[in-house]
């Protein structure tokens, strides 16, 4: 194997109450893609922040191109040739695509004027390389979340770096966008660029990566060639044990109908009808832009309903705000936990109890003991890894943030729990814990809607599945009768009847 272009040796970093990195190591080789794997909280993000100078490491050594380095911050590391694509977007919606790509390093002439034509041309070339069908003069805020992620990737490519770190780069991408990204990764690999690829999607790791480095509890566990390992072995390295079946669905006798939606039309939703029983998990599948999240938000009251009926336990409800949804007994866990679900500057306790303050109050007085007791109970139940309940939630790993978001909804004691992409950006160990919690709520008779872009997840955890296409339901299946081919056919517009004709 050739010499590493980047070496991190014995990196240590501690925060109050927790040792985030304990002798962590990473080697990045030119012309190769190194997967950096580990559960949420394993230290992956902390290691990358230590590399780029966001955090000052307590001990260890970083060598880049054979020389010891210690970067003062991301700008310093970028200038040296190391770029990082963060999982959270670092862009400004009110600026154009080109302005976002070249923000802080605009191309100027001898008089200090911005060379707009050159900047737009270079930005357009980057977008074309990533197969993004937008002009760089367009405002970033007009793009979908996945397209904005591609702009973030284009921004990193514009630095012409020797090392590129990609943190969950496909999290918000469609399959087509992911294919375009992989094409670019292969081009970068051929050009000799070293890439660090952080992802919880094991399929992607085995498709695009050459080698794998695993961290667990901040410690270096090992480095392996992808060709020399398999999914089970990788999972065991990550979690320290072998996991049983991936989707632990349980069978529960369903109760009476809890939620009934009839001819519902609203923002992005057209004439949708379905029922949901007590103790049932209803999976909602479909491609990006099919109207899945919009349907959930109309039911919850976050988007406007134009016509149709919503009944909860036989009574018609009319949610026009999220507060109405909560008051009616509907909890919605957003797909965008950082944008809609959590307040990153508040503590774990404050976030978890945010929607339950009325229930936890007597008059205008908050019952602090009851609040603390409830929060501590959920921290234990969900196995949330946090030094204290007063830890700022922005300092937690993605998986632990997601657990807090779900606990926040459950603290309202809902009749219907809507989970929109509940395991997005969550590692395999935390996924298993979330699935087990979902089963527990199901066994207690809660009605659950599971919206997911991962078809195996929908098939593995649901009792019944509806598929959406262009704001309508294009198919409905019992889980036992469904497979990925049927779901995908309905997702692109075929009806259940057409599916059955093809199967026959």
From Swiss-Prot:
Species for this entry: Photobacterium profundum (strain SS9)
Free-text function comment from the UniProt entry: Part of the ABC transporter complex RbsABC involved in ribose import. Responsible for energy coupling to the transport system.
InterPro entries per record: AAA+_ATPase, ABC_carbohydrate_import_ATPase, ABC_transporter-like_ATP-bd, ABC_transporter-like_CS, P-loop_NTPase
Enzyme class label: translocase
The protein's name in its UniProt record: Ribose import ATP-binding protein RbsA
EC number, UniProt record: 7.5.2.7
Coarse class of the protein's main subcellular location: membrane
Any one GO molecular-function label of the UniProt entry: ATP binding
Pfam families assigned to the protein according to its UniProt record, in alphabetical order: ABC_tran
Similarity-based family: Belongs to the ABC transporter superfamily. Ribose importer (TC 3.A.1.2.1) family.
Keyword vocabulary terms for this entry: ATP-binding, Cell inner membrane, Cell membrane, Membrane, Nucleotide-binding, Repeat, Sugar transport, Translocase, Transport
Localization, UniProt: Cell inner membrane
Segments forming domain ABC transporter: 6-242, 252-495
Membrane-crossing residue ranges in chain numbering: none
């Amino acid at each position: 194997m050739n010499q590493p272009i980047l070496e991190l040796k014995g990196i240590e970093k501690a925060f109050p109450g927790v040792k985030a990195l304990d002798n962590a190591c990473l080697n990045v080789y030119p012309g190769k893609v190194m997967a950096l794997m580990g559960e949420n909280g394993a230290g992956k993000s902390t290691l990358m922040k230590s590399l780029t100078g966001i955090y000052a490491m307590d001990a260890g050594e970083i060598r880049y191109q054979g020389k010891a380095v210690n970067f003062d911050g991301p700008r310093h590391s970028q200038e040296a040739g190391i770029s990082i694509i963060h999982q959270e977007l670092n862009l400004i919606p009110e600026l154009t695509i080109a302005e976002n790509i070249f923000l802080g390093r605009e191309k100027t002439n001898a008089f200090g004027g911005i060379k707009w034509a050159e900047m737009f041309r270079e930005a357009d070339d980057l977008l074309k390389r990533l197969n993004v069908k937008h002009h760089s003069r367009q405002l970033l805020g007009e793009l979908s979340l996945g397209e904005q992620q591609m702009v973030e990737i284009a921004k990193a490519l514009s630095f012409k770096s020797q090392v590129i770190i990609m943190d969950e780069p496909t999290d918000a991408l469609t399959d087509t966008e992911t294919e375009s990204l992989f094409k670019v990764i292969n081009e970068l690999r051929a050009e000799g660029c070293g890439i660090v690829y952080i992802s919880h999607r094991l399929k992607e790791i085995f498709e695009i990566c050459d080698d794998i480095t695993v961290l667990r509890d901040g410690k270096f566990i090992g480095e392996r060639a992808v060709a020399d390992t398999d999914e089970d072995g990788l999972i065991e390295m990550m979690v320290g044990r072998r996991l049983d079946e991936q989707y632990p669905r349980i069978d529960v006798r369903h109760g009476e109908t809890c939620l009934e939606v009839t001819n519902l039309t609203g923002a992005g939703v057209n004439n949708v009808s379905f029922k949901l029983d007590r103790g049932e998990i209803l999976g909602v599948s479909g491609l990006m832009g099919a109207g899945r999240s919009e349907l959930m938000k109309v039911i919850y009251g976050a988007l406007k309903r134009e016509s149709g009926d919503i009944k909860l336990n036989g009574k018609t409800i009319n949610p026009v705000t999220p507060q109405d949804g909560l008051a009616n007994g509907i909890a919605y866990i957003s797909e965008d936990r950082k944008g809609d679900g959590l307040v990153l500057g508040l503590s774990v306790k404050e976030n978890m109890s945010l929607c339950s303050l009325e229930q936890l109050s007597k008059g205008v007085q908050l019952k602090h003991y009851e609040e603390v007791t409830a929060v501590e109970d959920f921290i234990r139940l969900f196995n949330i890894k946090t030094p204290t309940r007063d830890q700022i939630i922005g300092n937690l790993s993605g998986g632990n943030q997601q657990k807090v978001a779900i606990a926040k909804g459950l603290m309202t004691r809902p009749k219907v729990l809507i989970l929109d992409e509940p395991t997005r950006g969550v590692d395999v160990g935390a996924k298993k814990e979330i699935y087990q919690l979902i089963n527990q709520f199901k066994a207690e008779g809660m009605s659950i809607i599971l919206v997911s872009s991962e078809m195996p997840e929908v098939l593995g955890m649901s009792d019944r599945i509806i598929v959406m296409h262009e704001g309508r339901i294009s198919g409905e299946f019992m889980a036992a009768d469904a497979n990925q081919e049927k779901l995908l056919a309905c997702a692109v517009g075929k009806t259940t009847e057409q599916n059955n004709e093809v199967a026959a």
